[in-house]
Amino acid sequence: MYTAAIMKTELEASKGTRKLDMRIDNIQLVNVFTREIYPASIGIYNERIVAVGRVETEADQVIDGAGAYAVPGLIDSHIHIETTLLTPEALGEVIIPWGTTTLCVDAMEIANVAGIDGLLAMIKDSEKLPFRLLLEIPSRVPTAPGLETTGGVLGVEEVTQLLELDEAVSLGELDPSKVLGMKEEYLEKVLASLNRRKICNGHAIGLGVDDLNIYAAGHLSDDHESVYYEELLERLRLGIMPLIREGS
């Protein structure tokens, strides 16, 4: 548990009256708030950055950044880990060297095969990973009801339970038929996410402006299916955040 006593030690490290765990000198800081790049040092204590800029506090470990650029960790805002054909551990070896430190994962394939138990097992295993794993709770398990046999079913009750997890950040992508068709089960899943102050991911492939209006009215926050610039602009105009992916 994060306590006031722990916070006090971090403030002392920031002030310079407590020894840092690590200090990284001689870096070029890429400041995404001010859009500047400038020389700086970084002070780290208790696995937190507690000082940035001119940092001279003594540290247990001092690293020479050799003029390298320091940037915030990158976040992949939508990924299906299973389709990478890599385990989360192996995927970490690929993404960490390139600066990605957080994945927002819609593990719909795991859920279709192993249900809620599979998702909980993945979350438990993620504690050992070198990156942060956040969960977009799969909204379509099974994906095609009546046309497939799955190892698990995530109804409204199961989705609501999963949305209570600290690792859950959203309701995973909903395809247009579920929203435009006003299917009550999926509307209840959307409400379960909104009532927990979490967003709902979209999958608005091929939708024109009229249908996009309905989609936006259904509280779908984003879409990763824009192929042409005009599609991206249509989504922006309606407040739907376009996610740009290489596959599109």
Language-model features: where?
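Histidine-rich, glycine-flanked metal-binding segment
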Residues: 2-72
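Divalent-metal coordination cores built from histidine and acidic residues
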Residues: 2-14, 92-199
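Hydrophobic faces of well-ordered beta-strands that scaffold small-molecule active sites
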Residues: 73-81, 103-105, 133-137, 169-173, ...
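Active-site core of metal-dependent hydrolases
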Residues: 173-248
